């Protein structure tokens, strides 16, 4: 298996601002990034349609294969998955948390009767190319979680970058799809749900700082961002305004979500988004929808997760076609 050691196909940029010393301990507790490419038949014709699934996998509890099967039953368009809270356990994760780094791990991670889905195993099972970068360790056990990109299409060089430290280590990951009409960048991110104890506990200022740095790192003209933005105060937050000012919108043409929540547990909030930046008119259309397991949106979870999956159905403009 490729990826148990640092892979040159992923460049990781460390955070050098406030809190960088504490981040050393978070880094010491996780395993190596994973990158591998499966052998797939070459795509005979230019890609005209693309499906992007963005989903918080609830640390491997989500039934990813079931959702992929549902999407595959509806379309044969290439699929790209932007997964937050992807779970991974392999020999690269330290068997024990480092002594001085023991606190730099996510807590509350009890064993489960049903095994969690390992993102590396899932990518192999689904026959998808993978770029995975861990953000944090899962408690005392030898596993971690992070952001992942899985793709039917070949992935160009991937990059990842640490966000400003607010509560926990967060590492978005991006990759480039080399398409006929030009490069399309896909990015998977997860902002902090809250801040440290005290006046900053709600995390609004922290998420704004993380969004600011995210936008500094994501510079492409054509970008699809799948993210758990954790906007506890909704689109009133400065983080949302920053994304809007950077030309990100909810689709092409942009349409604000009609659903009232994406986080399925209480309190039900809209935390998850697929946002598109299309400065060059490379995309003919991009429509975002929320997937529900139960038509009445009932049940304790949604396909095993506490978040709804979001799907973007993207139509690409043929190369050379002028905007109407």
Language-model segments: residues:
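Metal-dependent phosphoester-hydrolase catalytic domains
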Residues: 2-39, 160, 176, 216-224, ...
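Beta-strand-turn-beta hairpins that frame and shape the catalytic cleft
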Residues: 40-53, 143-147, 151-157, 168-192, ...
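Active-site environment of divalent metal-dependent phosphoester hydrolases
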Residues: 60-62, 88-91, 138-142, 194-197, ...
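Active-site beta-strand/loop signature of hydrolases that rely on acidic residues for catalysis
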Residues: 50-57, 67, 71-113, 150, ...
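Short, solvent-exposed loop/turn segments at secondary-structure junctions
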Residues: 58-60, 86-89, 137-138, 153-156, ...
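Catalytic-core segment of enzymes that process non-peptidic bonds
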Residues: 127-163
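N-terminal, active-site-proximal structural segment of metallo-dependent hydrolase catalytic domains
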Residues: 1-125, 132, 137-143, 317-324
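Surface-exposed cleft-lining segments at the edges of enzyme active sites
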Residues: 159-164, 191-205
